[in-house]
């Protein structure tokens, strides 16, 4: 068998979405279970809690119609709804779809010593490696609700937020893809250990 020549045609560039879906283990580590996706989203909620924003984080894992739906909600400060960046994406959309987008890079010390997870990567990882993901955030009397399919932005809704009992917060839910994980469910032993460390 002749050796295959390596030339300029062998070099190609992938988008962050394409690369992450081709090599999920680079960011997710062990891809036996989808545990890391939950860890990343929970870590974001914990970062808010540690800064004094909110006092409740809820995790719900549901198995229905042979599909897993994982949900994390908090009553932290939430994202600023409908705040549009120079690239035309809202802050919320970019935070879940544009790699290396984060509010934890500045040197103002706000998150110093508190930030968990893969800053600027974790929420995108969850989006990229799920069949679908949706996130709703609310604050200042407004909300923004966005949907992704296979890591690609699908649609957005926004409007007034009238629930005075929940003035601010964020809810993220997703369906991890079996294409990238041997088992799309989470390893509950790992999650229980993580939560025990956090609450202690």
List each model region and its residues.
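Glycine/threonine-rich ATP-lid/beta-loop region of ATP-binding domains
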Residues: 173-200
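GHKL (Bergerat-fold) ATPase N-terminal catalytic module, capturing the glycine-rich phosphate-binding loop
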Residues: 1-176, 181-182
């Amino acid at each position: 068998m002749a050796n295959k020549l390596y030339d300029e045609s062998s070099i190609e560039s992938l988008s962050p979405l394409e690369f992450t879906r081709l090599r999920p283990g680079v960011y997710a580590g062990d891809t036996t279970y989808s545990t890391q996706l939950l860890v990343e989203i929970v870590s974001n909620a914990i970062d808010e809690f540690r800064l004094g924003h909110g006092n409740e984080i809820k995790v719900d894992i549901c198995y229905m119609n042979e599909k897993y739906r994982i949900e994390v909600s908090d009553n932290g400060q939430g994202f600023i709804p409908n705040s549009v960046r120079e690239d035309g994406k809202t802050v919320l959309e970019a935070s879940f779809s544009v790699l290396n987008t984060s509010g934890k890079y500045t040197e103002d010390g706000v998150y110093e010593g508190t930030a968990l997870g893969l800053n600027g990567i974790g929420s995108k990882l969850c989006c990229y490696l799920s069949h679908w993901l949706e996130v709703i955030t609310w604050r200042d009397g407004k909300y923004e609700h966005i949907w992704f399919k296979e890591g690609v932005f699908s649609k957005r809704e926004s409007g007034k937020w009238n629930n005075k009992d929940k003035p601010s917060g964020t809810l993220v839910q997703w369906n991890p893809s079996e294409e990238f994980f041997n088992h799309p469910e989470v390893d509950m032993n790992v999650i229980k250990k993580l939560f025990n460390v956090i609450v202690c």
